[in-house]
Amino acid sequence: CIKCISCGEVSLLQDVCPKCKSNKLDRLSLPCQNCISGVKKEVLNLVKILTADLRIDDKNIRISFSGNEGFHLYVTNSPYNQLGSKERGDLIDYIMFRRAIPERFGFKKNNPSRSSFPDLDDPGWSGRVAKELFNSKSKRSKGITKIISDGYSVYRQRLEEMGKNSIGVKIDPNVTVDIHRIFRLEGSLNSKSGLAKLACDNIEKFNPYAEACLIDDEPVEISANLPIEFRLKNRRFGPY
């Protein structure tokens, strides 16, 4: 959707405001089930890295729906709890697969060796990189040949793109690095969405638009300007 800066009209995407014809527009982001499904996938990928790579017991990981567009993940009883902002920054780079260097993943700048490249059975990021690069063991040899042929710089760029677009976990670095941040209490309402922050015992089945919505059957008068249909508590609302 778009919101007109001049008159405040909210409408579907277009180049000018349908009410006052102004081209001064703001784009509005409205989360949906597809958005939440994508975020859930990132959370599950994060849990895999925390448990498999960092050896954190899954019993010490708690997941909460933030009340808006994402989830909060809490880790307790872990040596990582004592990390400062700088160390958390290094951890963020690892989780998001940032600043990966080709040497770490098999490509030595001088005289690269085929045997040094990661294998699909390798643990941690080596295995994830191999799966992304080669897809299957049968394609590994041919893939390595192309990587060496393309050169060091191309491989470094490809690792960077993989971190941004595919295998890197999408988290909020500003939240993770801030050791003084105060988080919303579970059970409280998010002022942007009106949904509650809730603990998620089963994130794969969790539906925030049903479970975190606290409306009941009592009629409530509201003022709304929203040109799309949405669902809360399995009921349809809009467009308004």
Question: Would you name each region that the model predicts?
Answer:
Residues 1, 26-34, 214-225:
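Short glycine-/aliphatic-rich beta-strand segments at the starts of folded cytosolic domains
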Residues 4-7, 17-20:
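Short cysteine-rich clusters marking metal-coordination/redox-active sites
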Residues 8-13, 23-27:
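Cys/His-rich microdomains that often coordinate metals
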Residues 36-54:
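A short, contiguous, amphipathic alpha-helix enriched in charged residues
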Residues 58-86, 90:
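Histidine-centered divalent-metal-coordination microenvironment in nucleic-acid enzymes
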Residues 93-172, 176-179:
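Long, charge-rich alpha-helical interaction segments
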Residues 177-192:
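Catalytic cores of secreted or luminal carbohydrate-active enzymes
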Residues 192-194, 205-239:
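C-terminal accessory/binding modules appended to enzymatic or scaffolding proteins
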